[in-house]
Amino acid sequence: MMVLLHAVYSIVFVDVIIIKVQRYINDILTLDIFYLFKMIPLLFILFYFANGIEWHKFETSEEIISTYLLDDVLYTGVNGAVYTFSNNKLNKTGLANTNYITTSIKVEDADKDTLVCGTNNGNPKCWKIDGSDDPKHRGRGYAPYQNSKVTIISHNGCVLSDINISKEGIKRWRRFDGPCGYDLYTADNVIPKDGLRGAFVDKDGTYDKVYILFTDTIGSKRIVKIPYIAQMCLNDEGGPSSLSSHRWSTFLKVELECDIDGRSYRQIIHSRTIKTDNDTILYVFFDSPHYVPIL
């Protein structure tokens, strides 16, 4: 695995989604969300095509809650609905009100459904993409109780997330659904309260490894930010004792360093992986106390 660092000098802090062209598929460009800020109501989505720029306006002002790209379909979660963009068409599926759609995920079960999950007025719930109920998947773990940033991934039918499964629970990284084994979670206070800044699965030899990225904050008078990447085996079987049987036994973290021209970048803002023929390249977007981003 390789981390590429490249300075970014022209970042403008505005309430928009910046979407970068990734590749051509079925006459539509697959889109890679380069950076996403917390946004006020957004009126349109901007897409880049081979023949120029095209604008797709929402019918009403919407606050963007989440965005996911699954099988060349862009899912955009808002309050009470999810928008899908595919084959140059923008569609809307209405769901319950006071329901912030934080998650769109491909569940690799027998039905291979795409689920959309939301807060559902403090009672997390999942639906199929057509808006019908999904009785097979609980909402807990798939969506938070209140609108907040989440990290959730699915690999070979196994679902992992940093979403609390109880209202007052401690933030943890969990494997909680699928054929990889029983539920596992990190120890107390390993995951920061604001959650992760990326997660992905990559093969290391014959084993599938899970990687997560986050920034830890230590100190009370003098605050210090420490960026980490951690790994664990996807098929981890837990610890040997009754107290550790549901803890990750292969969890290992290492500090990331990003020092350029004498300046240290210590806070992870966003991360993204790009797979090549021979490797997986990890891009990490760092920030510094001076608010000068770096990639």
From Swiss-Prot:
One of its GO terms (molecular function) is semaphorin receptor binding. Gene3D superfamilies: YVTN repeat-like/Quinoprotein amine dehydrogenase. One of its GO terms (biological process) is positive regulation of cell migration. Residues 1-295 form the Sema domain. One of its GO terms (cellular component) is plasma membrane. It comes from the Viruses. Belongs to the semaphorin family. In the Western Reserve strain (WR), the A39R protein is intracellular and not secreted as observed in other vaccinia strains such as Copenhagen strain (COP). The WR equivalent of the semaphorin-like protein is split into two ORFs which are likely to be truncated and non-functional. This ORF would be the N-terminal part. This is Semaphorin-like protein A39. It comes from Vaccinia virus (strain Western Reserve).
